[in-house]
Amino acid sequence: GLFSVLGSVAKHLLPHVAPIIAEKL
């Protein structure tokens, strides 16, 4: 379903977004 797609996308984006968030914090 839609949520499973969003979940898989989030798992792919998290490794890239986490370092950016860490730098802002």
Swiss-Prot record:
Organism's domain of life?
Eukaryota
Q: Where found in the cell?
A: Secreted
Q: Which cysteines are joined by disulfide bonds?
A: none
Any one of the GO CC terms: extracellular region
Please report the organism this UniProt entry assigns to the protein: Ranoidea gracilenta
Cite the entry's keywords alphabetically: Amidation, Amphibian defense peptide, Antibiotic, Antimicrobial, Secreted
The similarity annotation says:
Belongs to the frog skin active peptide (FSAP) family. Caerin subfamily.
- Outline what the protein does: Caerin-1.17 shows significant activity against Gram-positive organisms, but is less effective against Gram-negative organisms.
Q: Per the UniProt entry, what is one GO biological process?
A: defense response to bacterium
Q: In which tissues is it expressed?
A: Expressed by the skin dorsal glands.
Please give the residue positions where the record annotates the modification Leucine amide: 25
Protein name (Swiss-Prot/TrEMBL): Caerin-1.17
